[in-house]
Amino acid sequence: MTSFRKRTVQKPIRGTRTSPHTAQVITSSGNPYLDVVIGGGLPMGSICLIEEDRFMTHAKVLAKYFLAEGVISKQEIFLGSLDDIPAEMLRRLPRPLTDQESMEQSEVQALGDAGAENGLRIAWRYNDLPLVNSEHATAKIGHHFNLMEQMDSMMLYNVKTTLWDDSPKHLDIVIDEEFSKSSSPTTPSLEQQPVEDAPPIPGTETAPQEKMPAQEEENSANNNNNNNNNSSSVTSSTKTGSQDSPLQVFHNPRYKGLLNDIQQLLRNESFVAGTKNNLCRVCLTSLGSPLWYDEHFGEDLIKFLTLLMASVRNCNSVCLITMPMHLIAKYDASLVPKIRQLVDYAIELESFAGSERETHPAFKEYSGLLHLHKMSAINTLAVHMPETPDLAFKLRRKKFIIEKFHLPPELQESSAKPDNCISGLLSNSNATASLDF
C-alpha cells in the first residue's frame, strides 16, 4: 500500500482570500481604500468599529459599502438598527461598477484629475509613479460602487438577509386561533372536572350509609398523608424551578433580543468554523445611540460587546459596528476606552462639517480626518500599520476616498514673500539715505 494522497484544493468562501502577509482569511470591507489601510481587508472573526461623526453621515456610507459587498459576494447579511429602518437602508445600497467602468475610473484617476483642476501638469517621466492618494493601489479583492445610483432590487432577492429593528413579531391570527382551540377545548376532560362532579364509575357505587367507621378513619389518614406528600412535592418543585430559572444578563431587553437573533443565525451549519460554505456579515448601525439609554446603559453595552465578540470569533463571520462615540463620551467618558478594548479595529471619522476647518483653505480638499485608534493582531505576531497614520477622507458624489493627508502648496504666500522682501529692502535703503551725515 502506498501512502500517496491526492492533494485537493478547497475552494475559498465567496468574497474572501488568503492574505499573503499573515496567511489569514480576509474579506473586503466594501471600500478598497479602507481595505489597504487595515491590511488588505477584515480578517474572519473580527469586529470593526466605526466611530460616527457628529452628523452621522460618513459612517453610514461605510456601512452601505459593507452591506453592498456582502450582496455582491452572495454572503448572508444581518442588519440591526434602532435609528434607521433596515429595509429602507438595504434598498439604498450603492450600485456596483462593471469591470469596464472600474477600468475607466482608474484611468481617469491615473491622469491626475486633481492636477488638471489646479491648472498644473505633471512631467511625463513621473506618470508611472504612484499618486498621493494611491492607498488603494494594492487592493485585490472587493468591488467598486457608485454612490449616485442604487443597487438593483433583483440582487437583494438572491441574498439571505435578516433584519432587526426591535419591532414586535406578530404571529398569524388563523394559526393562533386553531392552536387555542386545540389546546383549550370547550368540554372539560375527566381529569379537569372536580371530584364531586365526576361521573361515577359503574359497578363501584356505594351508599354513604354503608361505609364502616374503620374505613373512614383509614381514608382520612391516607388523605392526610397524600396532602403532606403533595405539599412537599410542591415546595420541592418550586425550589427546583427557582434554581433552574435563567439569570437575567441584561437590564435592557433590547440587547437580549438582538444578541439572541445574532447567535441563532450564527449557529447555522454553513457558518461553523473550519467549514468553507459561506460567510455571515453582521452590521449594527448607531449602536449606543440615545434610543438605547437607560439606567444601566454602560453595563449592558459592555456585556453585549463581550458576548458579541465571543459569538463572532467562533464562526465564519465578520462584524461592522457604527457608534456615536461623541455622545457616549458625554454620557460616561470611561466607556470609550472600554468599548475600544472589546473590538479589533477602532476607526474614528472626524468631519469638518460645522467647524472652522470646513472653510480653511488648507482643508478644502477633504471632508474630514480619519484616526486609527486600534489595530489588532488576530492570530498574528505583528500588527499591520499603514505607511502614515495621518489619513483623511473625501466624500464625493460617486465614491468615498481615503488618502494620505497632505497640505496644499503655498503658491500665493511664496509669490507674496519676494514683494515684501523687496519693499523692505527699499525702505531700509531710504532710511539709510536719510541718515547721511
Swiss-Prot record:
Phosphoserine sites (modified residues): S183, S242
InterPro entries with a match to the protein in the record: Elongator_complex_protein_4 (IPR008728), P-loop_NTPase (IPR027417)
UniProt note: phenotype after gene disruption: RNAi-mediated knockdown is lethal in larval third instar (L3) stage.
Keyword Thylakoid: no
GO MF annotation list: phosphorylase kinase regulator activity
Keywords for the protein's UniProt record, in alphabetical order: Cytoplasm, Cytoskeleton, Microtubule, Nucleus, Phosphoprotein, tRNA processing
Metabolic or biological pathway, per its Swiss-Prot or TrEMBL entry: tRNA modification; 5-methoxycarbonylmethyl-2-thiouridine-tRNA biosynthesis
GO biological process assignments: establishment of mitotic spindle asymmetry; regulation of transcription by RNA polymerase II; tRNA wobble uridine modification
Recorded GO CC terms: cytoplasm; elongator holoenzyme complex; microtubule; spindle; transcription elongation factor complex
Entry's localization field: Cytoplasm; Nucleus; Cytoplasm, Cytoskeleton, Spindle
Superkingdom of the source species: Eukaryota
Pfam families, A to Z: PAXNEB
Gene3D superfamilies xrefs: P-loop containing nucleotide triphosphate hydrolases
Comp. bias (Low complexity): 220-237
Biased composition (Polar residues): 181-192
Annotated region described as Disordered, given as residue ranges: 179-247
Stated family: Belongs to the ELP4 family.
Protein function: Component of the elongator complex, which is required for multiple tRNA modifications, including mcm5U (5-methoxycarbonylmethyl uridine), mcm5s2U (5-methoxycarbonylmethyl-2-thiouridine), and ncm5U (5-carbamoylmethyl uridine). The elongator complex catalyzes the formation of carboxymethyluridine in the wobble base at position 34 in tRNAs. Binding by the elongator complex stabilizes microtubules and promotes their growth.
Subunit structure: Component of the elongator complex composed of Elp1, Elp2, Elp3, Elp4, Elp5 and Elp6. The elongator complex associates with and stabilizes microtubules; efficient interaction requires the full complex.
Protein name per the record: Elongator complex protein 4
Gene: Elp4
